[in-house]
């Protein structure tokens, strides 16, 4: 008798959908997935209902790949529900792992976000002063929408996470790695980062590295780069020195700097702080005014340093309220 199929769920919280597409990017391996697993819940692809999840027994699902951050009360509710129903919970992709790009919203308050989105937005009709509310009574019923939290949180802030699969989105090889590990019963220790390396991206990058001293910082489109030389040495801010390896150096090999989506390298406590330190250390000047001018060329320090990990940073660790 054939082994029973794995019972699998996939879900997106505050996310863009790229992680779901990454599952399909496994190409013909998706046919193997269909042979060994039943996908019981996947909102981006199947019209499942929360009631279907609620009706399942606790632990009925073998595996959940949860992508996306926790931005509102619905995200948290479904995360907690899937945690109860799943034997293995995986934070899948940068947003679930670290908070991701949605986490950059933590640089503004909820009130500032609402003001910009609903009151001071150039696309709004003049005179529109509508703000969202969580409850609205209409003729026949009361409508409810999720509560928008004050902060974006990573998945591990609200539920216990067994494994982490980094990337924006994860590479197809990582998707295969986590599925095969479950199928073969070869899961690593709880808390492991699956399908990624144990070094920095710089360690795997083959670009030539010389002395890192720069007089100005540039964005990729502002210069004609040397395709063989370290991007950071050319004044193009690259996060490879502080980022976990495992992506195959896809961005630098394509002429684009590493953005840091695989999260902090092993032994890096705060990826953004380490990135700021690395950039500051290569400024070729001792004159305070010149240093200020050079650093001032970086258009968005927060975005460069904490593009994917602000909710997981030490800057956020004192913030507990949802």
Task: Cite the ranges covered by each PLM segment.
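Iron-sulfur (Fe-S) cluster-binding modules
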Residues: 1-65, 76, 80-88, 107, ...
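Short glycine-rich anion-binding loops that position phosphate/pyrophosphate groups of nucleotides
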Residues: 69-71, 95-97, 170
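Extracytoplasmic/secreted cell-surface and envelope-processing proteins
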Residues: 74-75, 99
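Short gly/pro/ser/thr-enriched loop/turn and capping motifs at secondary-structure boundaries
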Residues: 95-102, 120-123
């Amino acid at each position: 008798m054939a082994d029973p199929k794995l019972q699998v769920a996939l879900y997106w919280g505050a996310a863009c959908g790229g992680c779901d597409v990454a599952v399909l990017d496994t190409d013909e391996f998706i046919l193997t997935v269909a042979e060994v697993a039943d996908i019981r819940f996947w909102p981006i692809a199947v019209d499942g209902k929360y009631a279907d999840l609620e009706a399942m027994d606790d632990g009925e699902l073998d595996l959940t790949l949860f992508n996306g951050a926790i931005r509102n009360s619905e995200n948290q509710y479904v995360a907690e529900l899937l945690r109860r129903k799943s034997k293995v919970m995986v934070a899948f992709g940068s947003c679930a792992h670290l908070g991701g790009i949605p986490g950059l919203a933590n640089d503004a308050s909820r009130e500032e976000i609402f003001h910009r989105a609903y009151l001071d937005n150039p696309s709004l009709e003049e005179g529109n002063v509508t703000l969202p509310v969580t409850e609205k009574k209409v003729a026949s019923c009361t409508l409810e929408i999720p509560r928008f939290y004050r902060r974006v949180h990573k998945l591990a802030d609200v539920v216990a996470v067994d494994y982490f699969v980094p990337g924006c989105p994860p590479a197809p090889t990582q998707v295969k790695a986590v599925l095969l590990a479950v199928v073969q019963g070869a899961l690593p220790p709880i808390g492991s980062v699956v399908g990624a390396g144990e070094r920095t991206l710089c360690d795997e990058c083959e670009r030539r590295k010389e002395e890192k001293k720069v007089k100005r910082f540039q964005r990729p489109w502002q210069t004609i780069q040397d395709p063989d030389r370290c991007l950071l040495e050319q004044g193009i801010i690259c996060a490879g020195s502080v980022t976990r390896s495992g992506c195959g150096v896809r961005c630098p090999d394509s002429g684009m700097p590493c953005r840091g989506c695989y999260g902090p390298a092993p032994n890096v406590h705060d990826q953004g702080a380490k990135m700021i330190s690395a950039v500051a250390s290569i400024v070729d000047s001792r004159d305070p005014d010149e240093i200020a001018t050079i650093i001032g060329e970086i258009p968005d320090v927060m975005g460069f340093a904490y593009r994917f990990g602000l909710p997981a940073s030490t800057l956020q660790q004192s913030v507990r309220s949802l």
